[in-house]
Amino acid sequence: PLQKHSIKYSPDLFSPCSWQDYSGAPEKMNLFNRNFQIMDISVVIPLYNEDESLPELTAWIERVMAANHFTYEIIMVDDGSSDNSWALSETLSTQNEHIRAIKFRRNYGKSAALHCGFQNAQGDVVITMDADMQDSPDEIPALYQMIMSEDYDMISGWKKKRFDPKSKTIPTKLFNATARKFSGIHLHDFNCGLKAYKNKVVKSIEVYGEMHRYIPILAQQAGFTKIGEKVVQHRARKYGVTKFGGLNRFINGMLDLLSI
């Protein structure tokens, strides 16, 4: 039987989310049965102050998984939220054996949260999505099939029609054009939160700093060159407000690109 564990982070026990000098180790984990299991999909959700969306999002994912008879886990990584996100994540993980919850001591950033989720992911295919419900879980089956049937190393979503203000969409277009030219990878939406990977891809890369923007480039540098793209739905934000700024985000992204 599955047994729940709620513990203080112990590097000797798990070491799931750290590299040598990384100080962003989780404070708490709610995890079921840490013996590795064979499963189809791990859904990794980095989150920061998204308490309003979590029950609805996880229920939607569960419906999609059940309808398609997938074996799966949902890994929610709370990046130091100051709202009720952790309490909700903890409750959801006790109510559903498929949900695992991890909490950071403070806000370390999306890259750290993704890296932590990647290190814990057990599924043959790892799918990432944002917690704000602007990514649709209904995209999961098609992304899974592209990895498994067409043998892609990773698939990046492309939000071709967006519901963002121009202060965000214009810098995003400039960023993507620059990333395409620099890397030679012909993607339209490098930073789309909705992506799918073979498990071995996420286990072969280290996502740190602000490098979540460049995961396709990191994967390519690690030898995974079959990278595809799928047009995905971009849903209008239902709860809360965006956590990102337009011009600052673009400038930081360009500086990170120069460091790769």
Locate predicted features.
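A conserved acidic beta->alpha catalytic loop
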Residues: 78-87, 133-134
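Short, well-formed alpha-helical segments that are part of the catalytic scaffolds
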Residues: 50-65
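Short beta-strand/loop segment that forms part of the nucleotide-sugar
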Residues: 70-81, 102-103
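Cell-envelope/extracellular polymer assembly enzymes that use nucleotide-activated donors
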Residues: 40-42, 73
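Acceptor/aglycone-binding surface of glycosyltransferases and processive sugar-polymer synthases
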Residues: 100-106, 110-120, 125, 137-214, ...
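Donor nucleotide-sugar binding loop of glycosyltransferases
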Residues: 50-53, 81, 110, 136
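Acidic helix N-cap motif at the loop->helix transition within catalytic regions
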Residues: 52-56, 83-92
